[in-house]
Amino acid sequence: MVFKRLLGAFGVGGPSVDTVLAVSRVSPGGFLTGEVRVKGGDFEAEIEHISLGLVTRIETEHSEGEHTGLGEFFRTEVSGPFKLGIGEERTVPFRVPVPWETPLTEVQGQPLNGMAMGVRTELAIAKAVDKGDLDPFSVAALPSQEAVLVAFSQLGFHFKSADLETGHLYGVQQRLPFYQEIEFYPPAQHSGRINEVELTFVADAGRLDIILEADKRGGHGSGHDSFGRFQVTHEQALQMDWPAEITAWLDGLAGQHHGGSHGVSYGGHDDGHHGHHGHYGHHEQHGHRSGPGMGAVVAAGAAGVVGGFVAAEAIDEIGDFFEGEEEEE
């Protein structure tokens, strides 16, 4: 038994863990449900806790360029300490809240190229190597978000890519330390003066911020970015004529002939259709660009972020997941 415990300290013959999701698709603000199945190994083990973390990939910008790192942006414990006997099997059900600002990985059933999401299970074992499991899941758009994305498709925008950036958006109540950029190629009628348009959603239970950023072409390389912002409730977003709103914003860009970052802000008025014009600032710690697409506009793909970087062992595990490999315990 002493020899088995010694081997257990190196991860040999220890407990195993497998997480089974009840559903593999959620929306921001929803719940990820399922159960963690634990099985005892060749020796009795002291389990310290079982935790679940939502993980993805994010791009950060520094003096030497851009860096892609893996991390988790939400973590919760689903079980406290307990003893696990030799060969004993236990099942721990869970219901984990999905943050409202969780980035999207698909639209209308089509994957967003550049995005992926996973839930990592950690089985912390006293005096032994911790065990883990990693399971992918997808994040579908809220109806209010999908209404905007559908409008982009109707206007002839073509999805380019999506990614996550560290930092916060100026003037936006943002909880997570990153934001998603969904990048589009403009329709033909705007391609002569706009390189691309980026779309960012920042949601909470009652409100949706929609931030638009146009990378404008300029003579002799003097292009600049222009911004637009809509702040509405989820109900208002479903009632708005988004093709008309986006078109009006694009048409307004044509009258901007001077450099710098400019924009139009639309407040959440009672009818949800009108706003006010104003100056809009740039992203704080803004890095690389990206954007979203819809149905026919969306391509397939994988990848996405950070709240605190995880340990090296977890990074290797997550890296395998984002490369599409299956983890073997």
PLM features: residue spans?
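Internal, hydrophobic beta-strand segments that form the core of beta-sheet-rich folds
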Residues: 53-58, 95-101, 109-128
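Exposed beta-sheet edge/beta-hairpin loop segments within beta-rich domains
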Residues: 84, 102-112, 201
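N-terminal leader-region detector that preferentially activates on the first domain or presequence
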Residues: 2-53, 63, 71-93, 97, ...
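Hydrophobic alpha-helical topogenic segments used for membrane insertion/localization
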Residues: 297-311
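A glycine-rich, hydrophobic loop/mini-helix early in the fold
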Residues: 67
